[in-house]
Amino acid sequence: METLTSSSQSLISSPMSKKDYSSEIICAFDIGAKNPARTVLEVKDNSVRVLDISKLDWSSDWERHIAKDLSQYEYTTVLLERQPRRSPYVKFIYFIKGFLYHTSAAKVICVSPVMSGNSYRDRKKRSVEAFLDWMDTFGLRDSVPDRRKLDDVADSFNLAMRYVLDKWNTNYTPYNRCKSRNYIKKM
């Protein structure tokens, strides 16, 4: 299902009550101006449910758009992809932290990107492959539109899933640090 709103394109969405204290709502943002992405997962009773995966648009009036995107759910944890010191996107991290400081009980955590390796292109390719594997696992592959630029939503989804798997002390091979050039061929 694809839902369109003025500031985001939702790839996968499902309704949820605003307050469910027995579950943990995890939100992960892949930061960027042109192609930011958000994934929202609900972890409840040792199961994971995908609530939302969205491509966002923060290219203009970014404060209003980010505030709107942050206000859609009541998160328990917000994961932000760590940015280099002089990155122009650091302002988004500070804005999100400041916005949630007094308005939410959510923990805000800056995390390193999930994939590591030799080249940017290889990391993005592995991220998309892992994302599509997870979509198969969740039975949501048909909901993912065919498009070339899936790496942003893949990165946000992988941030959230790595966080969940780390909490469960579960190892997932594609998320392991790998320096081999032939990693993709070995999968």
UniProtKB/Swiss-Prot annotation:
Keywords: DNA damage, DNA recombination, DNA repair, Hydrolase, Lipoprotein, Magnesium, Membrane, Nuclease, Palmitate. One of its GO terms (cellular component) is membrane. GO terms for molecular function: four-way junction DNA binding; magnesium ion binding; nuclease activity. GO terms for biological process: DNA recombination; DNA repair. The keyword DNA repair applies. Its cofactor is Mg(2+). InterPro entries: HJ-resolvase_A22 (IPR006932), RNaseH-like_sf (IPR012337). Acylated by palmitic acid group(s). Its EC number is 3.1.-.-. Belongs to the RuvC family. Poxviruses-type subfamily. Nuclease that specifically cleaves and resolves four-way DNA Holliday junctions into linear duplex products. This is Holliday junction resolvase.
